[in-house]
């Protein structure tokens, strides 16, 4: 029996018969692929249960869920808060006017971890602090009314200063899962200068209107270690979009059901809960509202 890797551990449970995990045990990133065909209809987001639940994680470490396929679909890049204990689901959207079938092995899914901070931000009306104590994302509000036309993308400008409070953590914008389940997704982007430019997609067949003050996306203060430097070609990284490359945290994802080392010391039986604890409410991060 080989010794366990000496790094932070994240425990998860996997119960799906529709997906298989393709990453090795104790990998720093969980990868999955579908075992059966998945039908993605036009204009209607497909919410796909993956059979994964995070059982125990570490404070200050969130998760990112990403998907990819060669077919004409768009996978919402999901932010999963460390306190979320519900089943993790991938949101897939059809980019065409016709049914798209993802046959076995054509959908690839990744779940990985990152370090974040939730600093206190003063005099900033557009950001709202995380709803739960373990949440990573600050809600960002629209400055003015927004209209999204069917099957089209729109560029939105947020004319506001960069809310950076420390050089070690950089603000990154993620879309909201609640909007993605309604067909509206936002490109992941680093907030490096002012004004902030967002690219928003409407994959429905309806014109959608959002008033000023609507929660349109989330801002997460991600540790700068996760962004490639000039040495990026010497490390393994993932592209969150065409412009944002990302290193995931060097942790061990441990399957609770197949863990030869499992003990009461390494895996607490029950986590402390209070009113500020997310549990299985919401959709992993920003909720459904």
Swiss-Prot record:
> Which residues make up the binding site for substrate?
176-178, 283-284
| Single Gene Ontology BP annotation | dUTP metabolic process
Say if the entry is tagged with keyword Isomerase: no
Query: Which reaction equations make up its catalytic activity?
Result: dUTP + H2O = dUMP + diphosphate + H(+)
Cofactor list: Mg(2+)
Provide the coiled-coil residue spans.
none
- Enzyme class name: hydrolase
Database matches in Gene3D superfamilies:
2.70.40.10
Annotated EC? 3.6.1.23
Q: Keywords for this entry?
A: Hydrolase, Magnesium, Metal-binding, Nucleotide metabolism
Per the record's keyword annotation, is Magnesium included, yes or no? yes
The record, for Pfam families, names: dUTPase
Could you cite one Gene Ontology molecular function of this protein? dUTP diphosphatase activity
What family is this protein classified in?
A: Belongs to the dUTPase family.
Relate the protein's function as given in its record.
Answer: Involved in nucleotide metabolism: produces dUMP, the immediate precursor of thymidine nucleotides and decreases the intracellular concentration of dUTP to avoid uracil incorporation into viral DNA.
The molecule here is called Deoxyuridine 5'-triphosphate nucleotidohydrolase
């Amino acid at each position: 029996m080989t010794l366990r890797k000496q790094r932070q551990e994240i425990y998860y449970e996997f119960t799906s018969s529709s997906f298989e995990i393709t990453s090795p045990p104790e990998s720093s990133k969980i990868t999955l692929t579908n075992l059966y065909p998945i039908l993605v209809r036009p204009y209607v987001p497909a919410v796909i249960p993956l059979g994964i639940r995070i059982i125990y994680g570490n404070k200050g470490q969130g998760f990112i869920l990403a998907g990819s396929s060669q077919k004409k679909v768009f996978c919402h890049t999901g932010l999963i808060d460390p306190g979320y204990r519900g089943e993790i689901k991938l949101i897939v959207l059809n980019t065409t006017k016709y049914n798209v079938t993802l046959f076995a092995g054509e959908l690839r899914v990744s779940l990985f971890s990152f370090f974040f901070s939730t600093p206190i931000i003063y005099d900033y009306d557009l950001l709202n602090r995380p709803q739960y104590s373990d949440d990573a994302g600050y809600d960002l509000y629209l400055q003015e009314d927004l209209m999204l036309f069917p099957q089209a993308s729109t560029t939105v400008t947020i004319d506001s200063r960069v809310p950076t409070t420390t050089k070690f953590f950089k603000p990154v914008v993620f879309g909201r899962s609640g909007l993605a389940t309604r067909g509206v997704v936002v490109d992941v982007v680093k907030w490096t200068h002012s004004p902030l430019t967002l690219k928003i997609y409407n994959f429905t067949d309806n014109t959608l209107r959002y008033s000023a003050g609507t929660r349109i996306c989330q801002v997460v203060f991600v540790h700068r270690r996760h962004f490639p430097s000039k040495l990026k070609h010497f490390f393994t990284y993932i592209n969150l979009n065409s412009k944002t490359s990302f290193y995931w945290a060097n942790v061990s994802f441990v399957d609770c059901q197949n863990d030869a080392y499992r003990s009461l010391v390494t895996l607490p039986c029950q986590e402390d809960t209070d009113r500020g604890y997310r549990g299985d409410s919401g959709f992993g991060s920003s909720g459904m509202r």
